[in-house]
Amino acid sequence: MANVDKAFGLRPYKGLNTGSAVQQANSYSIDPSGYGTAIYQGDLVIFAGGYINRAAAGSANIVGVFSHVYYVATDGTPTFKNYYPASTTALGGGAIDVFVYDDPNQLFVVQADGASAVTCIGRNADTD
């Protein structure tokens, strides 16, 4: 039976440090005026203009991997999601906090778009 083709971005697997059995995501900000691109769990992210943005294929200076977002919706509801809906704004222009796996010693599982040799296991992935 062939492997299932179900792309999921980068999924945290484990850390290389002895104390990092639990993956930890650190907090960053998205432009509170409403960044116009959706970001999904497992997407690579970069800094642009001081805020987190979704990385394009081949982007340099990757900050890390998007985990989830927290903000207070315009109706006053505290909101946690595993994706950032495009052009979201928070109540009163408040902060939109995104959580990013940014530890350089974090290992991830990622789906390839073709056959991979055994020698690829444990190596870096090219995002082009």
For each feature predicted by the language model, list its residue ranges.
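Surface-exposed, low-hydrophobicity beta-strand/loop segments enriched in small/polar/acidic residues
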Residues: 1-128
